[in-house]
């Protein structure tokens, strides 16, 4: 368990940047859970480098050849 008052520690830098961008509301409406998961996956794909890639939310493993952003547009 982690120390603190019921708050999980940040998993990485992407968590902070995602929260800021989400607060600005600059991307698109996150009304459905599917859009929410896809958006988080696109954010996490930065971990894969410059390749066109998609990171799953569960383990953030890179699957090269899949471009989540193109699929969204």
UniProtKB/Swiss-Prot annotation:
It comes from the Eukaryota. This is Putative uncharacterized protein YER091C-A. It comes from Saccharomyces cerevisiae (strain ATCC 204508 / S288c). The lineage of its organism: Eukaryota, Fungi, Dikarya, Ascomycota, Saccharomycotina.
């Amino acid at each position: 368990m982690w120390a603190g008052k019921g708050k999980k520690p940040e998993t990485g830098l992407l968590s902070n940047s995602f929260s800021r961008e989400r607060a600005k509301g600059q991307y698109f409406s996150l009304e459905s859970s599917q859009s929410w998961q896809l958006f988080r996956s696109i954010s996490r794909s930065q971990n894969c480098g410059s390749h066109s890639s998609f990171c799953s939310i569960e383990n953030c493993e890179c699957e090269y050849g899949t471009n989540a952003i193109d699929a969204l547009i």
